[in-house]
Amino acid sequence: SAKVVITEDANADKKVDWQDGAIAYRSIMNNPQGWEKVKDITAYRIAMNFGSQAQNPFLMTLDGIKKINLHTDGLGQGVLLKGYGSEGHDSGHLNYADIGKRIGGVEDFKTLIEKAKKYGAHLGIHVNASETYPESKYFNENILRKNPDGSYSYGWNWLDQGINIDAAYDLAHGRLARWEDLKNKLGEGLDFIYVDVWGNGQSGDNGAWATHVLAKEINKQGWRFAIEWGHGGEYDSTFHHWAADLTYGGYTNKGINSAITRFIRNHQKDAWVGDYRSYGGAADYPLLGGYSMKDFEGWQGRSDYNGYVTNLFAHDVMTKYFQHFTVSKWENGTPVTMTDNGSTYKWTPEMKVELVDAAGNKVVVTRKSNDVNSPQYRERTVTLNGRVIQDGSAYLTPWNWDANGKKLPTDKEKMYYFNTQAGATTWTLPSDWANSKVYLYKLTDQGKTEEKELTVKDGKITLDLLANQPYVLYRSKQTNPEMSWSEGMHIYDQGFNSGTLKHWTISGDASKAEIVKSQGANDMLRIQGNKEKVSLTQKLTGLKPNTKYAVYVGVDNR
């Protein structure tokens, strides 16, 4: 069957055009399962386990969730577990219920799922439905794909040699049952399934119908569907890795660059071309942003924690803010000439985008210049109900939702401040912030720090703060949530994330033991400059009799 919708002027611009049709189309279109969560998942990243090394056990990932919760003052998170099963990433494929024992097994995974809820962290797993490996119990002759000459069609070979499968055969011979096995093993709480490489045809037909059937199998278990390619699975997917991971893969596959599609679905998915200037075209400062994904837990060797946080506030907070609204009006400018990636071409940039929410609040995003050679081409002004909340490099943006999208009580409503440049900026506060005083906090991995009481004068405040440093503003004084580190790990604060050594018994010169940051800003214990033995001890807890345990201690001895 088909649906048709007829509309009048839907965005009050006194004309009827494609934009009114796009607004009306939302009333009859499909909505990908889980789209409502997308706007609140601000801190996406990958936690990587590979080659039997168990670099990020499940409960260590939980500590990372707590750390980001503090550093972002409670923004929602999305953690993709690459290597949740078998011996890690790209091992044991097709046996989805084979939870990796070295990283904690089923028990620790379920603990992670349950305890992550408190922090608004949405967990997903990386799977493959296109190839299989010899260690998988589903590796058998019937499912393997062959070339016309009868030889096997090979896939990845960086560990065991993977062999591509026949996806159509798999559909008819047990794929759904494997999803059900995983659901039965983990129970409720897993948020999304990321299907790697699907769409490149290595397993045969990965077209629209086959992709929709795969997505329905996953949705049936209560999970969101996510995919690798920027254009893949548009009907069902809410997250596209290559669209979000801007430095991964080539510029030709970075996301959907259709203005019409983005107009309709900007609030529903992270599939759009983000800001990466060298790619040109839509990637040269899209007004609505686009998810920019970084990591600090091993994917692509990335371990720069501070870089992750800086990127999140520079790109992703405003991208997610816009997703709390729907696009209502889109104005293009005049074509500009761009030269990149070996070609010169004309590109028509969007100059103004208007968005609204169900309560009638209106956001207007305006590019400062139509001249591609002007620095202001890559700057925007953003207003909320006529009040400026971003001006070029700086924003002071209200955030009135918790990590799961629920409205915050008035005394917890806040504004995030971030500026890529140092210097003073002046802001008009909303009328309901007409206090004589407001409270500013510097955000760090210890949460809200360095409280400053600011005087509101004529409804305005002036901020003169550090560049590339996130801050948060409140009406009243705030405290940080209490964190219990390394739950279930038999030792308290295995990663020294608490910022203190008070949980350790120190013998010798305690002044020589301190927590320091690595080059990637990860916390480490350092004992240095001591003239006598310095030791730190802590009693292991929760150990069971007649049970073997392994202790891993990472040491940099120089």
Language model regions located:
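Extra-cytoplasmic beta-strand recognition segments
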Residues: 496, 534-557
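Aromatic- and acidic-residue-enriched carbohydrate-binding clefts of CAZyme catalytic domains
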Residues: 85-107, 139-169
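Extracellular glycan-recognition surfaces and repeat-rich motifs
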Residues: 497-531
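Non-cytosolic beta-sheet module surface loops
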Residues: 429-432, 529, 542, 555-557
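Aromatic- and glycine-enriched glycan-recognition loops and surfaces
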Residues: 43-137
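Active-site-proximal substrate-binding groove within the catalytic cores of carbohydrate-active enzymes
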Residues: 1-15, 33-59, 129, 136, ...
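Beta-strand-rich interaction surfaces with strong enrichment in secreted/lumenal proteins
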Residues: 416, 461-462, 524-528, 537-542
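Extracellular carbohydrate-recognition regions
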Residues: 478-510
